Amino acid sequence: MPILAPAELLASLSRDQRLLGLDLGSKTIGLALSDVSRTIATPFDTIRRTKFTQDAELLLAVVDKQGVGGLVLGLPVEMDGFEGPRCQSVRSFAANLARLRDMPIAYWDERLSTSAVTRTLLEADSSRKRRAEVVDKMAAAYILQGLLDNRSGFA
């Protein structure tokens, strides 16, 4: 299935399917799940990256177990709107994943997601260790929640 616009992704889902948000980093992949009504994003897990095949296997196991019907990948667009090498890495990951599973995928601008989450954790007086444990999956939830909150603005 091709990469879809966010509105097309939401329209492609059946009533009881969830969305899985991904924050792709070089060392980890943060995961967040929507509820079945696709209203609330919840931090779910963090995958330690190894090889693509192993990462994809773990990711698709979550997709199957949690009733996921589509993926939302954070796209790390630079502040000036330029898509640098990190964006290309996310797009390559999505293309490779699409070869393994016919599943709708959409991108969502993730600018400042990790910064916003880190700031929230600092304000909550979380320890450095605790921040390191949760920042990736919370960033994934921030990305997914952004898409869920903005669906009324889709054309």
Curated annotation (Swiss-Prot):
A Pfam family the protein falls into: RuvX
What EC designation does it have? 3.1.-.-
Q: Name one GO biological process term.
A: rRNA 5'-end processing
Q: Which UniProt keywords apply?
A: Cytoplasm, Hydrolase, Nuclease, Ribosome biogenesis
List, alphabetically, the GO terms of the cellular component aspect: cytosol
| SMART domains recorded | YqgFc
Functionally, this protein is described as follows:
Could be a nuclease involved in processing of the 5'-end of pre-16S rRNA.
List the NCBIfam families hit by this protein, alphabetically.
Answer: RNAse_H_YqgF (TIGR00250)
UniProt family annotation: Belongs to the YqgF nuclease family.
Q: List the protein's name.
A: Putative pre-16S rRNA nuclease
Natural source organism: Paramagnetospirillum magneticum (strain ATCC 700264 / AMB-1) (Magnetospirillum magneticum)
Q: What is the lineage of its organism?
A: Bacteria, Pseudomonadati, Pseudomonadota, Alphaproteobacteria, Rhodospirillales
